[in-house]
């Protein structure tokens, strides 16, 4: 399973670890992914999403129904 937020689309970024001597070694910055079940009243069922903490705040703001419309418009099955 890929490390991509289903709401925001955030994915791992690539950067460097920097030592005290300024040596650079490659590293990945991973998104803060959580798996969360949301109750969708209009469908009378739970929907399981893999999303970041920011994605959860977006759902709090817009509502689960509006976010599901956006996700389905991109062609993802939910």
UniProtKB/Swiss-Prot annotation:
GO terms (BP aspect): translation
UniProt entry keywords in alphabetical sequence: Ribonucleoprotein, Ribosomal protein
Signal peptide: none
GO cellular component: cytosolic large ribosomal subunit
Keyword Metal-binding: no
Residue ranges, annotated region (Disordered): 1-25
InterPro entries named in the record: Ribosomal_bL28 (IPR026569), Ribosomal_bL28/bL31-like_sf (IPR034704), Ribosomal_bL28_bact-type (IPR001383), Ribosomal_bL28_sf (IPR037147)
Gene3D superfamilies: Ribosomal protein L28/L24 (2.30.170.40)
UniProt protein name: Large ribosomal subunit protein bL28
Gene name tied to this protein: rpmB
